Amino acid sequence: MCALILAAFFAGAAADATELMINQAVAIATSLAHDKLDDVATNAAAIDLEATSLGKPAAKISSAAKEMQKSAKIADVRNAFGKLSEALVGYLDAQKRKPGAGLKVAVCPMVDKPWIQKDGPIQNPYYGSEMLGCGSFKK
């Protein structure tokens, strides 16, 4: 009985950490789609903290989030964001989870990288205003 309670607790904690990482990644994607670095380092730090709490399964997420925190140029941040998004989408797939209500996984064909964004028109974080509508939603 105790083991079941602990398992349920840790599953809930992992779900909460995952939801927080997704929300922070969406915020980063939105900033990059608008060619801004506002709060990117702060959001990346929050993702790193949550990913670290999840341990080895989220290690790639943590590593990419750390890289984002060190980047000052938007091109470098976008490159690190690609790694973060691949790791986060891979983590969700491994957990058999969807991004959440009102969120979708999109893919940029130019860089062949995913991102999670709110439902609505494509807002490409990899090219921003240069190619804002470039991409498609994964089925």
Predicted regions span which residues?
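Bacterial N-terminal signal peptides
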Residues: 1-9
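Intrinsically disordered, low-complexity terminal tails/loops enriched in metal-binding residues
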Residues: 8-139
